[in-house]
């Protein structure tokens, strides 16, 4: 790469950095009016129990602007040790909706684990539609999420 191209690339990257930093600092979470995520369901249970399990308020963790309830102290401790592993993708919004550039509510019974990530869907039928092209829809959702964060995040 020529020195001129290198300098131009550095200038462009430097100018773009505030845009990325602003988006990165924004959050967009699917919470109830009290700040509770996943309708009060235990995020760890989706992985360990392979089903939605209602959390208990006595086992709660506040993380990244959301309140999570857990079914047990063990689940709470697992979450605290690695919250990124257990928090739902796309702020807890419907993954298929995000792939269509929309923020849509979820049905916890329509969850799925894809590549170790918790995806929530609007319904089991929507989950089936998402799974017709899981990789493609996930790529679209990842791409759209940045724009949704920028437009609707706080």
Locate the predicted segments by residue.
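Sec-dependent N-terminal signal peptides
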Residues: 6-15
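C-terminal segment of classical bacterial N-terminal signal peptides
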Residues: 15-21
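Charged, low-complexity intrinsically disordered segments
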Residues: 22-154
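N-terminal secretory signal peptides that target proteins for export/translocation
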Residues: 1-3
């Amino acid at each position: 790469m020529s020195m001129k191209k290198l300098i131009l690339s550095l200038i462009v990257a430097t100018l773009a950095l505030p845009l990325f930093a602003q988006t990165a600092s924004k959050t967009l979470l699917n919470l109830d009016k009290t700040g509770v995520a996943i309708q009060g369901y235990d995020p760890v249970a989706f992985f360990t129990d392979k089903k939605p399990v209602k959390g208990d308020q006595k086992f709660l963790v506040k993380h990244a602007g959301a309140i999570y309830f857990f079914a047990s102290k063990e689940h709470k401790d697992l979450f605290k040790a690695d919250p990124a592993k257990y928090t739902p993708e796309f702020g807890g919004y419907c993954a298929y909706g995000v792939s269509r550039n929309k923020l849509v509510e979820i049905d916890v019974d329509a969850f799925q684990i894809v590549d170790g990530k918790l995806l929530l869907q609007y319904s089991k039928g929507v989950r089936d539609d998402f799974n017709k092209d899981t990789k493609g829809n996930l790529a679209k959702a990842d791409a759209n999420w940045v724009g949704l964060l920028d437009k609707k995040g706080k």
